[in-house]
């Protein structure tokens, strides 16, 4: 079907207005555009109740005020049938829980409450089962001409058609010409030329009806070679080529014609060219065909390419001859402006090519007044058919419905297990209540509704007699269910559907009830103050005031004091320069004390008494730190008077003098090691990073037991089980006691001075004085825990943190072989130019157009994400943890069968080059053997990991298999890849190697011509069930028991799946010899 071009263009021009008009005026109906054989447009409405179609009251064009013709065509050029654009949906309002009737309009996709006509949001409604509304299932008629609209804008119409009233009348007469469908169908569309008289080549069959676009076989036109040039001016370039055409103007050729490429985009040109019907039928490019074969046009083609050029034909002649001589094919031509082609020559009108002639019809149809009557007759016949059908159905239906009743009856009795006799059935009174099943009465097909009522009557009256029927017709139980649903729906009490929220519920505690009259306007108004200019300036000031309080906090924290060397008297290392300055001031204040100390030292030299100066110094340092604490505390307090300060200083000086005096005078010279006082065991803290930075770990106080024990070790070193200490260098004259004393230098805590107490963590661990083995009172230091738990980071612990020991610590071997770290998943594709471009982007001019990475046409195989690689590789300890290991699947054999039938993607054969997302790496012929083992740790002290791993982990880490740490030598299916299975293949001297062709045992013809060596793929028998990693869940209470014994090699074969092949199953490895 080809629409009359005038009307078609007019529709397309006014399409927006038309749609708007139709929506506003006829929203109650469903409607669509349609046109008849002659290309006249109708606006077809349908009544949603009766499904009756009609021409809408004010049609699109004024001259079309008639009833609808019998044969209509849709905009998709198919026979027109009406699809509802409005669908009625029963839905539940998810707020109120009430059932409502909604109307869905497919065209503008709006949802309306059918009772109130309010627009409604589908998100707040569910269907009767409680699921979301699925509006995609409702389809509508084709109203969308948007494609054609675009094409009209690209091909601007040059002259707009304004029909004069005479032309309109003329067109109406033509439209009322009958259409003979039979003759239309007989035409061969590929029939381009038929010689009318065999010897005369001037006769062609190319003349066609201007509207319908098929060859007119009853009218034969003579070919007058003069008429192209004289009447039609066909060779006149201005007329033929200046309109917007799809082919190239032969005068302009390709170069001058910028219009075709500039004005419309490149692809649009192609769309127009290939969308048209004429092009689809013949495969060649018709623009060129016209240039080279211009003597023999196909008129059909010329017409398709010049849709806007108006054509004049002598209408009267054609009509007269058609009616008198024989009935022509439908002639429905608009009033044209130019004649189409050569005038028909009456002499040639022999009946040579007539295919079929309808008998009586044409003479009747020629007269105008009879035409509506004919159409009405057709409508009536359709109704008769509709009436016939329900009568037949009525005869068949009553039996199944009876059966449904029968089944209701029996279902109630099923719990009784006796065999049911007919007599029992008759004794039990049968009461069947069926709801009244009223269908809305449709006005036109009356017989249908009457018949349904009769059926309902029959159902109730039929007695239940033969139970045998139940068995045969059992599937008719379905109507029963529907009826029950209908009942439930009707039982919903009417008070619930309160669409306007008029009813107040009495027990609504949550909403404060108020009247609208109580709301004052002043409550709703916002106070409007002028904006202050200063505001933005004030905000930062507030921030500045708050900052010093933050800075003041670290000042209260004590600096750590560490004694580095004792040669210089007191050198103090501090964290902050501030605290250092304070300390200097403190020392200046206490110079007198230091002077006194020097005097004492000199006195000691004179009297030859052994003063343990180091201990004195330590006590002094303790005193100074205590002093510093007081100083910092005093900074926050109001300053005391100078008199008080002097008193305090004097007291302190006396204390120091007394201390030093005790040291020198009252110390008996035999006791080199002072008797330790009992000290309460300090709490130590479980390791956590922030605490360890702030706590300085001091070694424990030595006890007499400890010292005796160590001395004992030194004395009988050879006899003892433990290895003797090895690190005694030759020292200057000192006895053993002094050496030990130096090894275990410990801060003497003389006074209970107020020392800085670090903030206590919640998980504080109190260690009782327990004796581990033979080592009395040696408790594990938090520092040791810290280093033990972090051994895999090769951080050398500082000397001051180490526990006192008698052996040289072996240097930790730095791991030479460390696995390549996991490359982050967003690494570049190996053919991407990114690094290159980043380096050189300013240094060279880019000569090629860059492909837009968003362009879906170009990104085929390259930047695709890998289906197997996780977005983030799993954290290591999670991957190793045995609790999260997935159980081996007991349905193992079934899996193997699936594996065997797996559809391989087509590129498997070329899988040996690295996939696109992976960077290239150098070829490693084998994996280095594993050198380093985890250092042994005592399990008792491992707090960080709950399930303690094995002491020695023999196997290499199973890290993420999708990250290949080397280039594999053969194509691999990632799902199948097992690293452990390959252990020989990549060792030097075994297996396949690219570099040594002697290794390649099996070669095929493929290998000799294509250099790439083909190897056997991973075979079925090698596949073991791979336990895939499962992301972390809660640990199960116990490990599930494996389904089969640990070391069982084969499974007991089951009988069933072994089809025609009766040999017993044996697990063996099928080896391919290199041919795939």
Swiss-Prot record:
UniProt subcellular location: Cell projection, Attachment organelle membrane
Record's keyword annotation contains Ubl conjugation: no
Keyword ATP-binding: no
GO cellular component assignments: attachment organelle membrane; cell projection; plasma membrane
Keywords attached to this entry: Cell membrane, Cell projection, Coiled coil, Cytadherence, Membrane, Virulence
Polar residues composition-biased segments: 797-806
Positions of the UniProt region annotated as Fibronectin-binding: 264-284
Residues in coiled coil: 562-616
Region (Disordered): 326-351, 789-808, 850-873
Biological-process GO terms, alphabetical: adhesion of symbiont to microvasculature
UniProt biased composition (Pro residues): 336-345
Transmembrane segments: none
Cysteine disulfide links: none
Low complexity: compositionally biased ranges: 326-335, 862-873
Main subcellular localisation: membrane
Reported function: Binds immobilized fibronectin.
Protein name: Cytadherence high molecular weight protein 3
UniProt source species: Mycoplasmoides gallisepticum (strain R(low / passage 15 / clone 2))
Gene name for this UniProt entry: hlp3
